[in-house]
Amino acid sequence: MTQRRIAITGIGAICGLGHNSKEIWENGLMGRSGISINENPELPLNYAGFIKNFTLSDELLNPKEKDRFDKFIHYALQASSEALNQSNILNTDLDRSEIGCILGVGM
């Protein structure tokens, strides 16, 4: 069996520390925390990591459709768009059926 090689060509992230991997990295280096006091009485938590002040770009999703999708879809689109832009993979002649994306979510 032949082993297939993989390459990680771009990463994208969004969390309580920032809206992209660069912001998250820089805030982490400065010792900042993405955890804050929960002010939502419907959540049974005292502290949590909240994504604040985030608005998905109109380029990623038509403004008329934004309300149709939950916030986690907006976050996934943002992170995957960042990874694709970092990779520059869409500007190559690679077989797109050989390209994949791995997405992880933590709650």
Enumerate the predicted regions with their spans.
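Conserved "HGTGT" condensation-loop signature of ketosynthase/thiolase-family condensing enzymes
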Residues: 1-107
